[in-house]
A protein has these predicted regions:
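Extended, hydrophobic alpha-helical segments
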Residues: 24-34, 64-65, 72, 84-88
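Short, glycine/charge-rich beta-strand/loop segments that flank catalytic centers
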Residues: 40-52, 111-117, 152
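Charged, often glycine-rich, active-site loop that binds/positions anionic groups
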Residues: 43-71
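Short, solvent-exposed coil/turn elements at secondary-structure transition points
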Residues: 11, 42, 48, 60, ...
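N-terminal low-complexity, Ser/Thr- and acidic-residue-enriched intrinsically disordered segments
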Residues: 1-51
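Glycine-/proline-rich flexible loop or hinge segments
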Residues: 9-14, 48-52, 71-84
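A general "terminal functional-core" signal
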Residues: 69-286
C-alpha cells in the first residue's frame, strides 16, 4: 500500500469482544503491518490533540464517564473498561491523522476506525463510542467538509452532533442506507437515500456524488460494508471505485474509515475481504 493507513493495537484494546472492537486487527493482519502507520506517532496529530478535540466536542459528563466508567460509559452497548477510552482516543486520532494527511498532500488516506456515526455529543449509541467524524469536522475549523456516510444505517448521531456544534452550515452529509435506523431530520445538504437493490444502490451512489459541493475542502468517507447481504459484494466493491475515482477526478482530498460490517451476515474472512476492497480502491487513485 502506497497510501497511508492508520491503526494501532489500541483500536482493539477493549475487553468487550465484538466486530467493532476486533475486526480492524484482522484487517491490519491481512494487509500486513508494514503498511500500517500508528496514529500515536503521527506528526500531523498527537494523542493529546485528539484528546483536546474530543473534550471540546463532547459534553463534560460523557467525556469524564468514558475515562472513568461512569453512568454514560456503557451507552455504546459495551461493557466498560479503560480500553474503551483508549480505543476511542486512538481511533479518533486516526481519523484526524488520515484527514490531515489527505488535506496536506492532496491525496487519499485512511484509518481502520469504526464505531463512529451513531455516537452523539453526550452519549454513545449503536456500538459507537466517540463520533470521530464529527470531532474531526469540528477540528477543521473553517474548512468545508463533506461526509459521505455509506453504511447500512443512517448517521443520525453525526448530523445531530454537527447541529449541536453549530457547524452544519459548513459540513454537509449524504447518507446512502438500506434502512432508516438512526434517521435524522433532513435538509438540502443533509439527506438520506434508501436503496435496497443493486441497481438502485448504484444509481444512488452516482446521484449522491453529484450533490457534493465541488468546492469542498475534504471528503470524510464512512465506508460501511454492512449493506451486504441486501447489496452484493460486487456492487459494494464497484461503489468504492466510483467514490475514490470521483474524488480524484474532482481533485478533492478524501479520508476514509471502515464503518459497519458484521460477522452476523458473513464469515470474518469474507468481512475482512469486503473491507480490504475499500483499501484497494483507495490505493488505485494514488
Amino acid at each position: 500500500m502506497k497510501h497511508t493507513i492508520y491503526w494501532n493495537e489500541k483500536y482493539t484494546g477493549a475487553e468487550h469482544a465484538f466486530d467493532t472492537t476486533r475486526k480492524s486487527g484482522e484487517i491490519a493482519d491481512a494487509i500486513g503491518h508494514e503498511h500500517i502507520t500508528d496514529p500515536a506517532s503521527n506528526g500531523h496529530v498527537a494523542l493529546h490533540n485528539a484528546n483536546d478535540e474530543i473534550k471540546k466536542a463532547l459534553s463534560a459528563d460523557y467525556y469524564e464517564d468514558l475515562k472513568t466508567g461512569g453512568p454514560k460509559s456503557q451507552s455504546n452497548g459495551f461493557a466498560w473498561d479503560y480500553g474503551i477510552w483508549e480505543m476511542a482516543l486512538n481511533s479518533t486520532a486516526g481519523v484526524m491523522s488520515a484527514t490531515a494527511e489527505a488535506i496536506v498532500n492532496n491525496t487519499v488516506a485512511g484509518s481502520l476506525s469504526s464505531g463512529l456515526h451513531h455516537a452523539h455529543h453526550n452519549n454513545g449509541a449503536g456500538f459507537c463510542t466517540v463520533n470521530g467524524l464529527a470531532v474531526t469536522a469540528n477540528w477543521l475549523n473553517s474548512l468545508h467538509v463533506t461526509i459521505l456516510d455509506f453504511d447500512a444505517h443512517c448517521g443520525g448521531g453525526t448530523v445531530k452532533m454537527l447541529r449541536h456544534l453549530n457547524i452544519d452550515s459548513r459540513v454537509e452529509q449524504y447518507d446512502i442506507s438500506t434502512n432508516y435506523f438512526d434517521e435524522y431530520e433532513e435538509d438540502e445538504t443533509h439527506n438520506i437515500r434508501i436503496a435496497r437493490s443493486d441497481a438502485d444502490y448504484t444509481d444512488a451512489v452516482n446521484e449522491t456524488l453529484n450533490k457534493v459541493n465541488p468546492n469542498t475542502n475534504v471528503i470524510l468517507y464512512n465506508a460501511g460494508t454492512d449493506p451486504y447481504p441486501t447489496i452484493s459484494h460486487e456492487t459494494l466493491a464497484e461503489r468504492e471505485h466510483t467514490v475514490f475515482q470521483w474524488a480524484k477526478q474532482h481533485n478533492i482530498p478524501i479520508a476514509y474509515v471502515l464503518a459497519g460490517g458484521y460477522t452476523s451476515a458473513q464469515t470474518m474472512d469474507s468481512l475482512v475481504d469486503s473491507h480490504v476492497n475499500t483499501l484497494d480502491a483507495a490505493e488505485s487513485i494514488v
